[in-house]
Amino acid sequence: MMTGELILVGLIVIGLIGRSPIIATAACVLLAVKLLHLSRFLPSIERRGLELGLLFLTLSVLVPFASGKVQMKELIAAFNTWPGWLALIGGAVAAYMNAKGLDLLKLDPQMVVGLVIGSIFGIIFLRGIPVGPLMAAGITAILYKLFKLMSGG
């Protein structure tokens, strides 16, 4: 087995141990692509994977609006209460951090390894729940900027 395949198998095991089915599934799909000699599709997956993932994430978030589960009164309530305003601010901050995470992942794709290992550590030892690499990268980008500011760099 080649190094790439071994790493993918390792990520599958880590994903299973760390209760992160998305990591395990993604590694399984990529391993299947490699083993089925479909590696010619890897550049396309790399180039468009984040966009497709964000599209499906956005679709799932918007389903309550399309299905009518969210009514106009809930939309108005979001602007009339403190929890509603805090939710709006939280959503805006999360979107900003995700954008910074996307920028960081585009600049340094190898950062995913640290994000995956850090996420697994948090899941196992801090009783956290799996989050996407985008949010983890966003937090990393903010921490990186803070570190640079504090170190004078």
Swiss-Prot record:
InterPro entries per the UniProt record, alphabetical: UPF0756_TM
GO cellular component: plasma membrane
Organism: Paenibacillus sp. (strain JDR-2)
Name of protein: UPF0756 membrane protein Pjdr2_2290
Membrane topology: Multi-pass membrane protein
Subcellular location: Cell membrane
Domain of life per record: Bacteria
The entry's keywords: Cell membrane, Membrane, Transmembrane, Transmembrane helix
Coiled coil (UniProt feature): none
Primary site of residence: membrane
